[in-house]
Amino acid sequence: MKLATATMFVVIASAAMTTGAFASPEKGLEIAIEADSRDKGFGDSTAQITMILMDKYGQSTERAIRNRTFEGDNEGDKSLVIFDSPGDVRGTAFLSHTKKADSDDQWLYLPALKRVKRIASSNKAGPFMGSEFSYEDIASQEVEKYTYNYLRDEELNGLDCFVVEYDPVDRKSGYKRQIVWMDKAEYRVHK
């Protein structure tokens, strides 16, 4: 009888550990708020980016991109992405206005059609310009758009990290959840 009771305790304890019984929403939110506060104050930024797309045969295509982001105080950030090459995407532009609580506003300018296409909130999970990124990935990440669970501490590539689960509040999100490894020193996402 004692052996059966001890076995049952081990089974229940193991199940509790694997289901996130020790997850902490409070600590997860604290970590997310601290990461967000460390990202504030940049004002604006510019970047030259090279996007490399690989097909299933291993062939690659490079796209030259300019990015400009303006930090918003209470409304969220605004960013403009312009494709400079290759020729088939030259002049294509993507404008995003991130909102803290509501759905983001996003538009795509297609020079071949001379049209601006609004990206519907129900289409945020769609692929961004033929890449594995979604329109949702391109937008700024706002604390208010997720609930959080601190899962554990774990080392990743020699860095001491928090492991935090992000659960999107928006039911139209392309993600059910995201598990993020964030270093403890700088609060940067590494995985």
Model-derived features with residue positions:
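N-terminal secretory signal peptides that target proteins for export/translocation
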Residues: M1-K2
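Bacterial N-terminal signal peptides
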Residues: A6-A16
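Sec/Tat signal peptide C-region and signal peptidase I cleavage site
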Residues: T18-S24
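N-terminal mature ectodomain segment of secretory-pathway/periplasmic proteins
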Residues: S24-A112, N149
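Gly/Pro-enriched, hydrophobic low-complexity segments
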Residues: I33, L95-H97, D105-Y109, R115-I119, ...
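Hydrophobic alpha-helical segments, especially N-terminal targeting/anchoring helices
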Residues: M54, L110, E154, M182-D183
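Short acidic/glycine-enriched loop/turn segments that link adjacent beta-strands
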Residues: E75, N157-L159
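Surface-exposed beta-loop interaction hotspot
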Residues: S140-T147, D153
